[in-house]
């Protein structure tokens, strides 16, 4: 018998950071000439929406979108290696934290959010990727 506080471990709960979301696209890209001078955008639905709104702009500027709707910074941090580092971009633009504030994956403190964002920045810099941080948009609970 399942306890009341146990979650169903169905397929949607086994990939909490959503590593599979871009897995097939990442395999195709790998380390190719197409990645040369590429900039990856890492974030949540706001980021994901940018390339949906203006796909030509992303394509002509060699921008790659790795935003996932509803994502929080702990999920983004786990995805950072396969969705950014392993693609060998010259730069990454990181926008995250809005869904942390909203509590999408549980309560978060400002320190938790900034630690996750700074960890992504450190990983990027250690891998010779220029890092650009976007500020969290104003939110109200």
Question: Which sequence ranges carry the predicted segments?
Answer:
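N-terminal secretory targeting modules
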Residues: 1-41, 47-48, 52, 56-57, ...
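Short, basic, glycine/proline-bearing loop/turn elements
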Residues: 13, 63-68
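Conserved beta-strand elements of the Class I
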Residues: 40-42, 64, 92
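Short hydrophobic segments within beta-strands
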Residues: 42-43, 134
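Catalytic nucleophile serine of serine hydrolases
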Residues: 45, 69
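Alpha-helical cap/lid subdomain in secreted, periplasmic
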Residues: 56-62, 71, 78-141
